[in-house]
Amino acid sequence: MAGAMRKMAVYLGLVEDDGYDGRGFDPDDDFEPELDPEPERDRRRHEPPHQSHQALHPQRDESVRVVQPPMQRDPVPHSASLPAESVRPARIAPVASITQERQSLEKNAPVIMPKVVSEREPYRITTLHPRTYNEARTIGEHFREGTPVIMNLTEMDDTDAKRLVDFAAGLVFGLHGSIERVTQKVFLLSPANVDVTAEDKARIAEGGFFNQS
């Protein structure tokens, strides 16, 4: 209210306006006292630099998240994880020792000789002329010694001849030999270890051995 009355007094010239600065006065304008900028500038001039900087740029109250890099583990050397035996270089045997060892093995190895088939052993065929069955013992002894026997039964009767043939068949069977009929009453008894040739069998058939005893 006092301000309005002062404005009116100034307008009527009753009161001198101390703050008149030569500008036009409009009674309708709201009167706002002007602040002197000088004290503010003086205050800023005397303030320390960091305070003025803080006043101009206020510090933001924000939490800054610091991201720490992950911890790095020290690399483990490869040589530490490997056993000592694997790190050692392989020993290479000298060529000379390998050659000597091979020669020693070849020398000690048994030598396998090929089996040589021996030539047919010579044999002598015995011709017997039994007259009775009692001579069967003589036939058995020659045959058991490995001698081929020509059994000529032409001088025996049929009954004794038949009995002697049965004996010869049993003898050959027991000693793993063979019996062959040459003629009606002539038989060849061959031991297991003797192979009578075809030429000798032909001669027997022709009667070449009949006279041997």
Curated annotation (Swiss-Prot):
Signal peptide: none annotated. This is Cell division protein SepF 2. Homodimer. Interacts with FtsZ. Belongs to the SepF family. Cell division protein that is part of the divisome complex and is recruited early to the Z-ring. Probably stimulates Z-ring formation, perhaps through the cross-linking of FtsZ protofilaments. Its function overlaps with FtsA. One of its GO terms (biological process) is FtsZ-dependent cytokinesis. The lineage of its organism: Bacteria, Bacillati, Actinomycetota, Actinomycetes, Kitasatosporales. It comes from Streptomyces avermitilis (strain ATCC 31267 / DSM 46492 / JCM 5070 / NBRC 14893 / NCIMB 12804 / NRRL 8165 / MA-4680). Pfam families: SepF. Residues 27-39 have a biased composition (Acidic residues).
